[in-house]
Amino acid sequence: MDTPNKDDSIIRFSVSLQQNLLDELDNRIIKNGYSSRSELVRDMIREKLVEDNWAEDNPNDESKIAVLVVIYDHHQRELNQRMIDIQHASGTHVLCTTHIHMDEHNCLETIILQGNSFEIQRLQLEIGGLRGVKFAKLTKASSFEHNE
């Protein structure tokens, strides 16, 4: 029989907040469809852990994962090739790309990246700075261990 691992258990703790902050928390729960305050707080903690993980400046840490979403004018001359060249030249691993034709003028591309935070963010800035790129947003992720 397996004995429960301390890390697998849910720990209950209390938090003291001002009323206006609690009201904001409750409004966010309703707005985002959370089932409880605990669910929202867990998500907020996870988000902060990812943010802190990305802030750690370790050039040898290649474990960062991100998705770069790019919207661009596909009529812009040689833009697609320049985006590909930047990806190939970067120190970041491009794990996957997906290309979608949004309309007659615009394409959306998602680029899944793995590497260190500096190289990933540099790639975002390089692609985002190209003429014809209308939007370039990086969503950062991290693979820290946690239980649902």
Swiss-Prot record:
The keyword Nucleotide-binding does not apply. Signal peptide: none annotated. GO terms for molecular function: DNA-binding transcription repressor activity; nickel cation binding; transcription cis-regulatory region binding. GO terms for cellular component: protein-DNA complex. Disulfide bonds: none annotated. Pfam families: NikR_C (PF08753), RHH_1 (PF01402). InterPro entries: Acetolactate_synth/TF_NikR_C, ACT-like_dom_sf, Arc_rbn_hlx_hlx, CopG, CopG/NikR_regulator, Ni_resp_reg_NikR, Ribbon_hlx_hlx, TF_NikR_Ni-bd_C. Binds 1 nickel ion per subunit. One of its GO terms (biological process) is negative regulation of DNA-templated transcription. Coiled coil: none annotated. NCBIfam families: PRK00630.1, PRK01002.1, PRK02967.1, PRK04460.1. Belongs to the transcriptional regulatory CopG/NikR family. PANTHER family: NICKEL-RESPONSIVE REGULATOR (PTHR34719:SF2). Transcriptional regulator. This is Putative nickel-responsive regulator.
